Amino acid sequence: MAAELIKEYVPIVSEYAPGLIEGLLSWKGAVGLVAATGIGYVLIIQRLQNTSATKNLWGLTGGGVQAKDVSKVADVYDKSYGKEGDGSLTLHHLDKKESVAVVDTFYNLVTDGYEACWDTSFHFSPRPRFTNFRTAQILHEARIGYMARIQPGFKVLDCGCGIGNPGRTVAALTGAHVTGITINEYQVKRALYHTKKAGLTGLFTPVQGDFTDMPFADKTFDAAFAIEATCHAPKLEQVYGEIFRVLKPGAFFAVYEAVTTDKFDPANKRHVEIINSLVYGNGIPDMRTWKQAEEAGKNVGFKLCCAFDAGAASPVALPWWERVKDMINWGVVKYTKAACLALDSLRLLPKDYWKVANMVGDSLPDLVESGETGIFTPMYLLVWQKPEE
């Protein structure tokens, strides 16, 4: 019986997770398999416990997409990207409305997976050597609040809030009231759940909306921040312009922007391949350079107060891509993809959910390489001020 199972399933697993069988022969592979088995076990248990308050977290339901539609929606996402004449992979062939819809689709598909595998802060951070990953994430969030000059009682905008952990951190540390905006309705539901659980209802309020056309009046907020979110805008000027509009005169806006650095060479084929992978695997309409990000803010009227790569600022902090590299080296990425395939086959996940796991997982080695080569940073820190009237 065992021989028959091996004969039937080894080729399937090898097809979707190359190197899996060989990897099992190493001690790291064994550890990774145990981790994936544990994840799969929790997925199954939580899937069966329909009364669980976090069933969507571990059930990997596809967010706002119905289970029966996940396969179709994943295919639509895949076909949304097209290569430009220079080989870059962008959504330029889509209009603004269609581009926003693609980003919404992306977060419907990946939010549960992000929360399950990465926690409630959907961003990277350099890690001081005396801290763990979770502490490093909070320190990274606290810094953006400090750079935006946030004070107690301020009305603050978290632009592209995801499921809200940065906004909750800033609100809890500063005493400000933070309003977060995300394009994805499912993320609002997750944010509300975690905000109530943290006892921060009233200090952090998530709303659903397009950050290139925000439902807020002019001069509403005393400060604003964004963490690895405005990269999802069709054009940076569109989101920066809206932030400028809703800020009061004299207010500060701090952002960790995902951009290519001056080490990126558009004539280097490998560089372009890496950036294409990041664009596709992260739901980004287009990748901008650090210079384009600076110019975008100036074009809408902001005064640039400071700008630097927060990921390269410290010579002693562990790099922002460290955790992803560890996940790859320890086999967590490979075996999680295989676990999703197995759970999909058992109909414990939406049909073809493995496509989503592969969409994100396949880009992770390129993400690490982008950091190691220095051609990309997800945290180019820009601090802007809206001029006084």
Curated annotation (Swiss-Prot):
Sorted alphabetically, the keyword list is: Endoplasmic reticulum, Lipid biosynthesis, Lipid metabolism, Membrane, Methyltransferase, Microsome, S-adenosyl-L-methionine, Transferase, Transmembrane, Transmembrane helix
- Gene Ontology, cellular component aspect: endoplasmic reticulum; membrane
Q: Where are the transmembrane segments?
A: 25-45
Cite the InterPro entries for this sequence: Methyltransf_11, MeTrfase_SMT, SAM-dependent_MTases_sf, Sterol_MeTrfase_C
SUPFAM superfamilies named in the record: S-adenosyl-L-methionine-dependent methyltransferases (SSF53335)
Q: Where is the signal peptide?
A: none
Record membrane topology: Single-pass membrane protein
Pfam families (alphabetical)? Methyltransf_11 (PF08241), Sterol_MT_C (PF08498)
Q: What is its main location?
A: membrane
Where in the cell does this protein reside?
Microsome membrane
Entry's Gene Ontology BP terms? methylation; steroid biosynthetic process
Quote the EC number. 2.1.1.-
Q: What class of enzyme is it?
A: transferase
One molecular function GO term is: S-adenosylmethionine-dependent methyltransferase activity
- The protein's role, per its UniProt record: Unable to convert squalene, botryococcene, cycloartenol, zymosterol or lanosterol to mono-, di-, tri- or tetramethylated derivatives.
Q: Which PANTHER family match?
A: 24-METHYLENESTEROL C-METHYLTRANSFERASE 2, PTHR44742
The record's family statement is: Belongs to the class I-like SAM-binding methyltransferase superfamily. Erg6/SMT family.
User: Any idea what this protein is called?
Assistant: Sterol methyltransferase-like 2
Q: Which organism is it from?
A: Botryococcus braunii (Green alga)
Provide the taxonomic classification.
Eukaryota, Viridiplantae, Chlorophyta, core chlorophytes, Trebouxiophyceae
Q: Which gene encodes it?
A: SMT-2
